[in-house]
Amino acid sequence: MAILYYDEKKLFQLNTENTTYVIGLSPEGYVGHVYYGPLLHGEPDLYPLRMDEPPFTPSVNKREKSSFLDRFPMEYPTGGVGDYRESCLNIRNAQGRMGCEIFFDSYEIFKGKRPLTGLPASFGTEDEVETLEITCKDPVLDLVVVLSYSVFTKENVITRSVRVKNEGSEALKVEKIYSACLDMDNEDFEMLSLHGSWGRERHIQQGALRYGKQLVSSGKGESSHQEHPFVALVTPGTDQERGEVYAMHFVYSGNFIGQVERCQFDTVRMVMGINQEEFCWNLKAGDEFQAPEVVMVYSAEGLGKMTRSYHAFYRRHMIRSPYNHKKRPILINNWEATYFDFDTDKLLDIAREAKKDGIEMLVMDDGWFGKRNKDDSSLGEWVVNE
């Protein structure tokens, strides 16, 4: 089984072929992050969720040290409860008060993966993927938060998503909802992201992780040439074959944020989701909201292993084309050959030569309409230029 639950220790263990992800439950019911890294053989332990309280701790529970939420490694941190690092979920009630505190309620482990309502998402058969859903509740807001983890064993991928449901009688405002969080001790991590512009996309930007917050985001309604919804943490000296990589990629083409925060206790929090800028969702009584999916990969063999994991995963579990696993038809486009200067005879010559090489379709590009002989006229005049 890819997903195991140890009832006595209150631990969930998610295994791929080469990696392990461990989630633990504190005595108070907080859902905490225990481990993500190379495959573990045998049962993990809960001790990473215990820590000493530093001075000036706003603790409300003298019995357990995990009550200090500003240092607790949360699986899904919420705003307004004493964790002053970046939150993943901010809820405002009908009276205008902001705050949400969720506690473990139940879990379900099942083979396969359910679709995400209204969203693009990965898929797989019951033999290819196994899913853990952890249900948490805020008893004050009557809010249900379901944390979903799908384990694609062969590809060494774990996908995450979140959905919330208002089970109360009053509407709630969702002011922020991210899809994933990863809390870890700092290992001199460097942050890697991708930037660019038109014609020069996906340039690697990598640098030391400073105290405070570093991010990549888009607030213009799309991911783009300039910003890509991908963030990775890498250990120093990481190259294509060596080094540890913790990566997140967002399956969403709208506003997004990928952020890494190094806090005062030298822990690191990486989050990803819908950009909270220009976002607010009115969650009426009985309504649900489904957040998009994040694809997580861990590699102990550098960026090359990470890249191959993503490539294999997207080919097998994201692309729904009937040509996914067979050769695709080939087409040719006349633009680079002719620019605006073409007529019927030129196009037929291109088509005849292309057919000799097995090309099955000719696409006629810019210049066929209006008096479109240069790029400063006739755009939008949908009349054939003969």
Predicted regions and their residues:
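Aromatic-lined carbohydrate-binding/catalytic grooves of carbohydrate-active enzymes
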Residues: Y323-E386
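Terminal connector regions
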Residues: F152, E293-P329
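Conserved mixed alpha/beta catalytic, RNA-binding, or beta-rich assembly cores of soluble enzyme
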Residues: V260-C263, I274, E301
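Short Pro-Gly-centered flexible turn/kink motifs
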Residues: R92, R97-D105, W281-A300
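Polysaccharide-binding surfaces and accessory modules of carbohydrate-active proteins
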Residues: K10-Q13, E17, V31-E261, E277
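Short acidic, Pro/Gly- and aromatic-enriched capping/linker segments at domain boundaries
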Residues: M1-F12, T267-K284
